Amino acid sequence: DLANFLNCLGARVRGAGTDVIKIEGVDSLGGCLRYAVIPDRIEAGTFMVAAAATRGDVVLENVIPRHLEPLIAKLREAGVEVGEEEDRVRVRASGPLSPIDIKTMPYPGFPTDMQSQMMALLSTVPGTSVIVENIFENRFKVADELKRMGARIKVEGRLAVVEGVERLQGACVRATDLRAGAALVVAGLMAEGETRIDNVQYIDRGYFNLEQKLRMLGARIWRAPYDEKTPAQDNAVRKSALI
């Protein structure tokens, strides 16, 4: 998409989406008055996983299904119904789900930015699921927070083994990064009781009005101010929480 935008401005960029990108310099850029940025596949994917986790029925519009193919394939493998149209997808999950294995890979493989949300989903799927993180190190910090909610997850290096439990329990948890925060929101939607997620400034980096969009789908979620008398953990800057 960046290459398309630059070419719209008069740049000469070839090979976008391949292993080799060739750029020929030009004197100046300009002339592209309007450009529509492609939809965020990770935001769309997060809503898809949330729909599956809550056994919901959700239609997402203004998406590019082919950008979501790795996630769609894994959701279907787990037993989730995913219908595709030109610019929308429908996610339905009414029956029992099955455990799956996931390996993160560079695009067009399964995105590392979706494995935390899938870990939350798989935490209540009966059986054993395995997640292998091939992109980044220390990408499983959310596992400790999910375990506060009753999840059974064992992490060894780049490998996480998820043993599905019947139900998660609401708890006070902390977002350690952007995608971990999104995963905890998914977990909170599934859990019995109230879940409080601190450090939501991480979530705000990648999701605009997340709680409002979820409320439109029927979720009971709101943003609450911190009690200033409570000391911040690890000197983190904490301004609000999602409940």
Curated annotation (Swiss-Prot):
One of the GO BP terms on file: peptidoglycan biosynthetic process
Pathway per the UniProt entry: Cell wall biogenesis; peptidoglycan biosynthesis
Gene Ontology molecular function, alphabetical: UDP-N-acetylglucosamine 1-carboxyvinyltransferase activity
Claim: Cell cycle is one of the keywords in the record: yes
Catalytic activity: phosphoenolpyruvate + UDP-N-acetyl-alpha-D-glucosamine = UDP-N-acetyl-3-O-(1-carboxyvinyl)-alpha-D-glucosamine + phosphate
Keyword field: Cell cycle, Cell division, Cell shape, Cell wall biogenesis/degradation, Cytoplasm, Peptidoglycan synthesis, Transferase
Uppermost EC category: transferase
Subcellular location: Cytoplasm
Gene Ontology cellular component list: cytoplasm
SUPFAM superfamilies the record matches: EPT/RTPC-like
EC number in record: 2.5.1.7
Record-linked Pfam families: EPSP_synthase
Main localisation: cytoplasm
The keyword Cell cycle is annotated on this UniProt entry: yes
Function, as annotated: Cell wall formation. Adds enolpyruvyl to UDP-N-acetylglucosamine.
Family as reported in the entry's similarity comment: Belongs to the EPSP synthase family. MurA subfamily.
Chain sites annotated for binding UDP-N-acetyl-alpha-D-glucosamine: D113, I135
InterPro entries in UniProt: Enolpyruvate_Tfrase_dom (IPR001986), Enolpyruvate_Tfrase_sf (IPR036968), MurA_subfamily (IPR050068), RNA3'P_cycl/enolpyr_Trfase_a/b (IPR013792)
Name this polypeptide is given: UDP-N-acetylglucosamine 1-carboxyvinyltransferase
